[in-house]
Amino acid sequence: MGGTKIKIGIVHQDTILASASIDSYSGEGLRPRLPLIKEIVDKLLERAEIPITSVSGLGISSPGIVDNHSKRILSVDKKFGDAPDINLEEWCLLTFGIPFFIENDARSALLGEWKYGNAKDADNVILMTLGTGIGSAAVTEGRLLRGKHFTAGIMGGHFVINYKGSLCNCGNKGCVETEASTWNITNIAKSEKSFTKSRLADFPVIDYELIFRLAGEGDAMAIHLRDQSLQAWSASAINLIHAYDPEILVLTGGIMASSAHIIPYIRKQVETHAWTPWGKVDIREGKFPATAALLGIAHVVNNG
């Protein structure tokens, strides 16, 4: 479940047999989307010719702080604000009659890359997602980090990189997610004095696809926003590296459609500024930018 889209899939091992994507309307809550989610699941099962009795379970990859033991969403950051009040396991059992599993979305994406993708079989990995928000997750010494209160590894989007920065949805100021993610980039752009001189002013909604495209065409404001965001993401990557001591950093998410610009920039900044006397962190693009979380939550369903 993302801030912009909800992806739904039927997965067998590391293969997605059928999938669909719907608008999340996350600001309106999760409960109104549950009937449509059921409808899509039923259609996908029919398309794949799989009876519900053959399904191992249903897994949800959710933003926010997730207790995978009690199978509850504990806290969310504006997206799907009603989710902590919903007993999703009960909904799953009543709706489908199959076991239910849940995990944080960034952890799910990391599981997908760690088990099947570009971090396969590594023992120390961090993943950073660049999308509607900024997410992170970590594998240390071969273990997926969750922590006593289920926040270990996933707070990368809320590392402070500008203590005088804008107020974040989490209540802090200057989080990397506030400084450089899709949900706030329109506000950032419109706050710039020279915004009206930019072609960006012709668009009611600004995203990174537009910013990178106009930057490539020489728009000064787009170049400024692109470079400012690259610096913010690099600072976040370095913070994650210093916090979790990985061998591999995987970058994924919708913004990675511009990976040809993002990967070289972050790699150079990490090599220049990260304190890693043992050597260089291997920075890789995710193998499954759109489906890693589906594969990861399927792994949770199949392995508990």
Indicate residue ranges for each PLM-predicted region.
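Short glycine-rich, Thr/Ser-proximal phosphate-binding strand/loop in the N-terminal lobe
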Residues: 1-35, 39, 72-75, 144, ...
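Glycine-rich phosphate-binding loop plus the immediately following alpha-helix
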Residues: 6, 94, 102-106, 160-199
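A mobile "lid/hinge" subdomain adjacent to the ATP/sugar-phosphate binding pocket shared
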Residues: 16, 177-250
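Glycine-rich phosphate-binding loop and adjoining helix at the ATP-binding site
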Residues: 26-38, 53-58, 64-124, 261-272
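Phosphate/pyrophosphate-binding loops at sites that engage ATP/ADP/AMP, CoA/4′-phosphopantetheine
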Residues: 37-58, 99-100, 194-200, 237-249
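Glycine-rich phosphate-binding/hydrolytic loop that grips phosphoryl groups
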Residues: 101-114, 256-304
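Glycine-rich phosphate-binding loop of actin/hexokinase-like ATP-binding domains
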Residues: 120-179
